């Protein structure tokens, strides 16, 4: 915050800040308003300058806000509002897992365009095309879901804090062009999933 002008009024006279500087009555160059208000020597010199010129001090300091200060203030206000409004949800969606299988979980949920084994059927069944011809794969998976859930509705109460999710899959690639597989997984309930892919090659 820079001070653009200082008006010293009294007896019908006004002296601008630049005029006071030119008269060498006060030597404060490009002062900041908080600095002036808290700087006792500067205020004393200001009173002295007013007394020397015979002008009563009416203390009218006019600050000039710069665009940078306005932007900083606005950004700070917006950031404060965002922080106040952002509250944790403490929610979970266990049925929409971030990854299926150990490989997918270790790779941050990968499975749409990368073969992570039998579990990739859930993300993209086309990854069965990466299996070698004449091979079969059997997989078993287990995973824990641990939300803290309680219910109290019309006299019915229930509580749950742990659920075990099982997965069983069998995949077989009989020929180079056909890949068949069947996977059973716990998606809220046992839900068998069948996937068939056909690989086409251009010659």
From Swiss-Prot:
UniProt protein name: Uncharacterized protein in phosphoenolpyruvate carboxykinase gene 5'region
């Amino acid at each position: 915050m820079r001070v653009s002008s200082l008006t010293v009024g009294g007896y019908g006279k006004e002296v601008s800040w630049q005029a006071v500087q030119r008269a060498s009555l006060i030597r404060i160059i490009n002062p900041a308003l908080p600095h002036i208000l808290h700087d006792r020597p500067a205020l004393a010199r200001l009173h002295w300058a007013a007394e020397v010129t015979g002008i009563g001090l009416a203390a009218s300091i006019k600050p000039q806000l710069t665009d940078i200060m306005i932007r900083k203030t606005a950004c700070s206000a917006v950031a404060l509002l965002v922080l106040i409004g952002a509250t944790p949800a403490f929610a979970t969606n266990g049925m929409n897992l971030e990854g299926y299988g150990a490989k997918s979980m270790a790779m941050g949920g990968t499975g749409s365009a990368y073969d992570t084994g039998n579990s990739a059927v859930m993300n993209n069944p086309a990854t069965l095309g990466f299996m070698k011809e004449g091979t079969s794969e059997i997989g078993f998976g287990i995973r824990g879901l641990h939300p803290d859930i309680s219910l109290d509705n019309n006299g019915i109460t229930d509580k749950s804090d742990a659920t075990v999710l099982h997965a069983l899959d069998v995949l077989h690639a009989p020929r180079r062009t056909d890949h068949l597989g069947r996977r059973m997984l716990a998606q809220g309930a046992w839900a068998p999933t069948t996937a068939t892919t056909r690989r086409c090659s251009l010659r």
